[in-house]
Amino acid sequence: MEKINAVITGVGGYVPDYVLTNEEISRMVDTNDEWIMTRIGVKERRILNEEGLGTSYMARKAAKQLMQKTASNPDDIDAVIVATTTPDYHFPSTASILCDKLGLKNAFAFDLQAACCGFLYLMETAASLIASGRHKKIIIVGADKMSSMVNYQDRATCPIFGDGAAACMVEATTEDYGIMDSILRTDGKGLPFLHMKAGGSVCPPSYFTVDHKMHYLYQEGRTVFKYAVSNMSDITATIAEKNGLNKDNIDWVIPHQANLRIIDAVASRLEVPLEKVMINIQRYGNTSGATLPLCLWDYEKQLKKGDNLIFTAFGAGFTYGAVYVKWGYDGSKR
């Protein structure tokens, strides 16, 4: 029996129209364009600022584009998985809302929460479902409305984040392409350094939590930066060595777009030139679970069948990991 691989067959993306520039940020908090560009690498970010729109709105836009590009029949979709830290509601899942918006009748749907590592977990989960032989066509979506949890009076966090979504079609194949390997790790000791203090079952919403601004993202930036550089660099080098990849045969590195200095550190560890590294943080900021697929969306035209791609990310938990993908189609023809 031939081995079943899971291959990405298409990419769709969406970012909101509203552009929040560094100049606007500098009018909200004590900062400036030079500091933000030097310390973070973000020039502007997109914000979903229309009343009553949430993560599923962006996810639908991205997934709809994906289905059109891949000429997919809604009845053929077996599953929809959404990675998000900012769901529309605590329940039902954003994925179930997305199923309805896409008119999918035969799919099962669920969310997963791995913060900025969400897309790595999506690829691993979809690959496992495909490998079971019971599922052939799965939509995976990384989507986050980070503006919904950012305090725009906090100069340490508000310049970093933006909103966006991107979706990939993952299908079964017997060809030697697709999601080839992954290394995923969790260090639960990261809780104190990156979290939202209230809103869950430990500290439910109340007048007190709202008054004390406990529903915003909290981050100890220096600690997170140190862990991110170390773990992303190490795990990326490990998966490369494990699969016989090096600076000569790695075609693209796709790092989580959290900070340009972290991206530089990962590229340096692999000795890969920045020309081989997908970077769009300057335009979108950190969109959490959407950063990796948004990179694919931006760079799709440059991808060639057989390209070796290494994805790597680090997020709250702490979660971190790397995924090796052998690209399955010529992006210039899409």
Curated annotation (Swiss-Prot):
Gene3D superfamilies recorded for this chain?
3.40.47.10
The enzyme's first-digit EC class, named in words, is transferase
* Pathway the protein acts in: Lipid metabolism; fatty acid biosynthesis
Show the catalytic activity.
malonyl-[ACP] + acetyl-CoA + H(+) = 3-oxobutanoyl-[ACP] + CO2 + CoA
**Annotated region described as ACP-binding, given as residue ranges:** 257-261
Q: Please name the catalytic residues of this protein.
A: C116, H256, N286
Its biological purpose is as follows: Catalyzes the condensation reaction of fatty acid synthesis by the addition to an acyl acceptor of two carbons from malonyl-ACP. Catalyzes the first condensation reaction which initiates fatty acid synthesis and may therefore play a role in governing the total rate of fatty acid production. Possesses both acetoacetyl-ACP synthase and acetyl transacylase activities. Its substrate specificity determines the biosynthesis of branched-chain and/or straight-chain of fatty acids.
Please state what the protein is called. Beta-ketoacyl-[acyl-carrier-protein] synthase III
Which source organism does the UniProt entry give? Phocaeicola vulgatus (strain ATCC 8482 / DSM 1447 / JCM 5826 / CCUG 4940 / NBRC 14291 / NCTC 11154) (Bacteroides vulgatus)
Gene (UniProt): fabH
